[in-house]
Amino acid sequence: MTIPTISELKKDRIIPHVFPNDKIDLNVDLFISFKAGKEVNHGNVLDIAGTGSVPRNIKFSEEPPDGYCFVLFMVDPDYPSRLRPDGKEYIHWVVSGIKTKELIKGTQKNCVTILPYVGPSIKKGTGLHRISFIISLIKEEDKDNITGLPHYKGEKYITRVKFNNYESVHNIAQINNMKIVGYNWCQIEG
């Protein structure tokens, strides 16, 4: 596991598409693996098969400090395509209240699943999509009260395309006094 460098983030245009500038201080390494050992690793290309269910294992290089917890976001900044990302960041999954260095099958004691997992569903011909995993720190008392996220009322009623007009994890982090501390991504083509 290694933390992505600013030059890596610029090369794959994570900066400016996910983070607006290089004023990002990533210090928590993030390891993600799906079924059959498919690992997310700094923009590697994965086949969409096997990403339909929650990642089997997510590891962090460290635990959050006392009084804080991690919030894990999984988003697609290339929705509906990288050339025309009109939907801004499509939200695939949000889990809050993570207090340990490992999340097995998407949960652990005291975690709050704010938005249940929805795997990538990418239309053919839209090119590679950068599926992004973002870790932020939030005060533990605020773990289930994050402003700007859509409210989950069952799959039939949810619109995941928008962060209630806040457009991105970066903006959600700012309005909720969260600090983004970790990032990893893969690319998936429909």
From Swiss-Prot:
Q: Which Gene3D superfamilies match?
A: PEBP-like
Origin, by domain of life? Eukaryota
Database matches in Pfam families: PBP
Q: Which key words tag this protein in UniProt?
A: Lipid-binding
Alphabetized GO MF terms: lipid binding
Residues that span the membrane, as ranges:
none
Tell me the InterPro entries matching this sequence. Answer: PEBP, PEBP-like_sf, PEBP_euk, Phosphatidylethanolamine-bd_CS
Looking up PROSITE patterns in the UniProt record yields:
PBP
Q: Which family does this protein fall into?
A: Belongs to the phosphatidylethanolamine-binding protein family.
What name is this protein filed under? Putative phosphatidylethanolamine-binding protein
